[in-house]
């Protein structure tokens, strides 16, 4: 088959199969229950024995195409839930971090690669809060880095305070990167 769907990758044989299939040219879709894209990569690597992990990181760096992490959040108006998505595409910078075992640096790359279609969870949560879709508390609960999220919130408050002192017209653009167009 050209495309393989692996329902849940939670053990060594399943992850080993998925990685090997991807390495041999198959398009593999799979799920891993984690809270971030970096955690997803770590989970796949860490099921292997320590002596095999460098090779697995190298295989993932070469064959991985994208990782998405999803959270459902309660809407502020209680009318249902809204999807928040973290998106990582396997660029040269990401592949290098995976290969070197520096997945803890992936959030920094996500935060600065929006124009390439990537999106960090914390920035997406802040957007949902700013647009009045979710409460600050709901967004904060799902934030990957609570301190960074709080900093984003404080920056936003400072910008709003500065604008309110200046007066005048404020125009907002709802332009979104191509990776977000299909989710709305």
Regions found by a protein language model. Give the residues of each.
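Short, flexible helix-loop junctions that flank or precede catalytic/ligand sites
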Residues: 1-184
